[in-house]
Amino acid sequence: MSGLPVSHVGEKVSGGVISTGSPTVHVGSSAVGLADRVSACVPLVGKPVNPMLGSKLLPEEVDFALAAPDTFTFARGYLSSNPRIGRLGRGWWLPGESMHLELSEDACVLVDAQGRRIGFPALAPGAQHYSGSEELWLRRGGSSGGEAQAWRGRWAAVPAELQTQEGSVLVLSGHSYLHFQRCPDGIWRLQASFGRAGYRTEFRWSGRGLLTGVRDSAGRSYALVYQQACEPSEGDDGLRLFGVILASHDGPPPDYIDPQSPGLDWLVRYQFSDSGDLIAVRDRLGQVVRVFAWREHMLVAHGEPGGLEVRYEWDVHAPHGRVVKQIEAGGLTRTFRYLRDATEVSDSLGRVERYEFAGEGGQRRWTALVRADGSRSEFDYDLFGRLVAMRDPLGRETRRRRDGQGRMLEEESPGKARYRKRVDEETGLLVELEDAMQRRWTFERDERGNATTVRGPAGSTRYAYEDPRLPDRPTRIVDPRGGERRLEWNRFGLLAALTDCSGQVWRYDYDNEGRLVASSDPLGQLTRRRYDPLGQLIGLELADGSALSYEYDALGRQTRIADAEGHATLFSWGHGDLLARVSDAGGGELSYLHDEAGRLVALTNENGVQAQFRYDLLDRLVEETGFDGRRQRYRYNAADELIAREDADGRETTYAYDRDGRLASIRVPATEHAPALVERYRWLADGRLASAGGADCEVRYTYDEVGNLRLESQVHADGWVYSVEHSHDALGVRQTSRYGDAPPVAWLTYGPGHLHGALVGAVELAFERDALHREVRRDARRDGQDDALFTQERQHAPLGRLQRSRLRLAGGFDWQRGYRYDGLGQLVGIDDNQYPSVRYEYDLGGRLLASRRAGAAASTYRYDAAGNRLEGVGEHAREDARQAFAENELYRSGFSRSETRASQAGEGPARWAGNRVERIAGNRYRFDALGNLVERIGADGERLRLAYDGAQRLVHLTRDYADGTRLEARYRYDALSRRIAKVVLRDGVEQQVRFGWDGDRQCAEAFARELRTTVHEPGGFVPLLRLEQACEPDPPELLQLRQAFAAEGQPLPAQCVPALGEARIAFFHTDHLGTPLQLSDERGQLRWQGVPDDWRAVAPERQPGAQPIRFQGQYHDEESGLYYNRYRYYLPEAGRYASQDPLGLGGGPNPYAYALNAPTLAYDPTGLIIPLVVIGAFAARAAIGAALGAGIELGMQTGKQVLGQMKDNWDSDRDLTDIKWKCIDINWKHVGASAAIGTVAPGMLSTGKTVVQSAKAIRTLSGQAANTANRAAKLAARKAAHADTIKKAVATQAAWQTGKQIVKCPLKDEEEECPPQ
């Protein structure tokens, strides 16, 4: 029985022909290559234990891993059921020494790192075997006579000298080769590992069978030093690995190393008990980072000094023993009850999970999980034990089809969406992909298997590999448009230089260990980084000379981020690596309280007020009480999808999903001011949104063959239609856009989409960019005219901040501005020739304290500790938490009033305990139980009343003026929570305005006789130009025609587009934040001018006109004075939002704050996120928000880890839905509006799962996705995970790091590293 897939048996099949062509038929027995016991990696519980085997497993912990073309990772792992005594003691494995072969005349046995014995028939010279269950190949060099099989296909990368050596055995797993040879002690040991590119890691052995040295693919040498740790006994010579020395950075190690010599670079050291058990691991600094305790050589405890501590109790202290209890210090205690085909695990919270199994020995598999709530998930396997189907608790099944070697060829989702791939029969390399929409991508490869051409719907991307030292690193990439990028690599296989399609060069320098120490951009601006010996980033010096420093505790958790001025954010950690406290430079502090399950149960904000969280049996958030007492409750279905949310007013919103778990509908409850409604969502097979329909509007999306959004049609309930149409180039960059009936806009771009021109009507805009592709000049001209309508110039500071700008109009207007920044990157002054110069001041938390304009009194601002605006000049002592809680009770009952207990006569309060500011700037505010502003009373008695629908969208308002007149307005929204119309009734006259949308950007205002179209700069919210046209209402016939074409996903034909009035073009001219301050016309004359204001953006207007855009993404509603800001409304007089952040605490601890109270530096175009434009104090404050989000999301996800193992295992097994997008130039443009559905449940359109944003973010925040820049040691990586949590958020929100990376994307376990895209 050969165990070979039928497609490789050839002449042994009848007639030498595979008549069925079936790739899943096997000849021989599935026992070939079968292990004596199943792998212990899945399932895992707790810290962790395998409930199927009862074994304690410590997954590999990396002690060091220095960058190399193929990085050598020195990792140790432990499995209690492994009886083998390694060089760290019984049950431990290390690279190189933990795998070996046993060859005899009758059999071949591969002993893996877990001590499992994988059995094969005898391996004669030249013979090969395949294990279907382990998915690996064995082949021996030489020939036993007869016709030898050629070393081609999967074996082509094996050097010729090994092909002919009978004393060489190759193990092929994925695309990695392990070369074994017989050592003097008679054991076949690992001599080298290598891949298709030829990078070799070599292992050197002593005559006693000790691994004494390793040479990695970068040429470094490592020396392993041993000691006599215990007395020799049967099967144990007592020798243990004392440590590993970095012996040489480039070259072989010295012939002799004295371990006692000073100055040796010990990468890791180990300490043992007198019984030979490992009791401590020391890092490169000599610090103890891991400790272990033993009884009769069985692990009974492990931990980290000052951190994790876990203890275990066993039924028997022997390798066949099983864990009966696991105790986490400060955490859960779990007990294990073993049955014949199941294990029940109960924890100290009284929850019981049941793991069910089938089969025996190496064929035993995990078949079902019954969770604490009774929900059941099931898993199916093929003959070789490979996962082929999953059924979730709702019975929804995902299936896979595999070929004879277990390679996945097709995946079918529960909704019957199919993804297919074709691989090369010999090498297993990807040849073709087909997605659920039947789009195909094909791959051409060179002799090494590198992808040289990828052809897809958008065209071809070509790759060249011209560096013989690094044959798998691309040196040239040509995109489908012909743009070419060049890449240079250093000896570690790290990117050294990148030349873009414009010839601009970015350079990267590394130290001897592959850590990025300096990077320079095409302007020569340099960024430097410093590291400690553990590879942790401790200093970052940016191009303008500003610097950030980082500190860590002994466990590698980040404890401090500070700027050059010493302004710091501090982090304190509790048990289980859970964040306990964060404090910023201004003294603001957030405290986190977790329960024994590691769930965040209380959060105390800077005002000493507490938010609380409750969870169900599965660790899902079921109740959340905010700082203001707003209580929200959540319900889920058996598949963990959110199905209902009950708000503080008792109203319930419900959610339904399709079979693929995508949001299908939302039922929004009725309120006093709006009826109940249902909003429905339809998806294409590949997961793109096809339509979103509600009571007032249906939005339909049409895509081109590549997947780019081609047409968005918004069909109102009364038949009115607005459509936006785009065309794209091969890179997915917009080339033309047509907004409704306005003239089309042609975009002229270069490279990956940098704008250098735009054509609209008879006007052309031209853009000049610097070497970093930042705009430095813009002008506009009419056809046939040499003179520019305007010229706009910009100069940038080293970090990209706007430093100077100048606008010159043909009509003579000349506007010049200069911007000043301090060492923290905060804007401290603006010099302006058209407006009074201004100076700004900030507190230590980065909040705007004052603005001083020439010739005017200073405007000053005060805040409580939580960032709520205060009135008055007096300072009050902080109230204690008890007083804050009592005050919060006002909101818990839904009661709100203007006075608070913190007020004193004649002054405002010292803080707003619930973050609901009730008085500011002479106005009084009242909120409902949900935190929505329902009334504003002005100093003159003017009264504004606001009313909301069940999705917390403003639908009605009345404004009673002091003179007794009244105004009334009503608003309508689509299913994406975009405002599509408003009707204003003033003095008995009703006016309706409709709005058209381009994704998240409002692009049109349609009045009864006028259409105004706003065109934004590509990819952002900064307005570029405006088109104004006279129009007439569509006749019924045209409306029907529009509806018919929209229903078919087609734009209205050009011959049917009504002739509107001549388009009048106006150009926006903005400040450093993208706020319009000037508007010029097509004659080069100034048409509108606004006066900048700290919180209002513009107030007043020097040349009044209809220009309602304020801060990016904001639209001034004249009828209310509010600014519509996509998902919320902004109160300009208060500098805050009128309702809470739909993202909840994910948007930060203060749900009303705008741009972190720094409107001179930051902006919020959607009312959800804050894309900060500077670093400095904001880095620290963004970190606080990141830590807050981490706490909530981690708390919600801890209970899902076990089921997630199967999903992760499933995903890691060549998931087509991941593969197809990771390594191909596919422009996966999401509809702008589909990132969130507004105040109902933001994020659910993209995840369709829970109230948190994404499981991937959870894994990142929990450290599972942590990486160091140079693949540094896992020990350092694990420590850096805490810093990574913080840094990722800071990098996203504060742009604190300017370096770029080329990212490698593995094709899962195919181990294919895709060229940078």
UniProtKB/Swiss-Prot annotation:
Database matches in InterPro entries: DUF6531, RHS, Rhs_assc_core, RHS_repeat, T6SS_VgrG/RHS, YD
UniProt KW GTP-binding keyword: no
Start-end of Basic and acidic residues biased regions: 403-415
Keywords recorded for this protein, A-Z: Virulence
KW Chaperone (keyword) present: no
GO MF, any single term: toxin sequestering activity
Disordered: annotated segments: 395-419
Consequence of gene loss (knockout): Deletion mutant together with deletion of its cognate immunity protein Tsi5 leads to a significant loss of fitness advantage when placed in competition with parental strains.
Gene Ontology terms describing biological process: protein secretion by the type VI secretion system
Purpose of the protein: Toxin secreted by the H1 type VI (H1-T6SS) secretion system that acts on bacterial target cells. The producing bacterium is protected by a cognate immunity protein.
Name of the featured protein: Toxin protein Tse5
UniProt organism field: Pseudomonas aeruginosa (strain ATCC 15692 / DSM 22644 / CIP 104116 / JCM 14847 / LMG 12228 / 1C / PRS 101 / PAO1)
Underlying gene: tse5
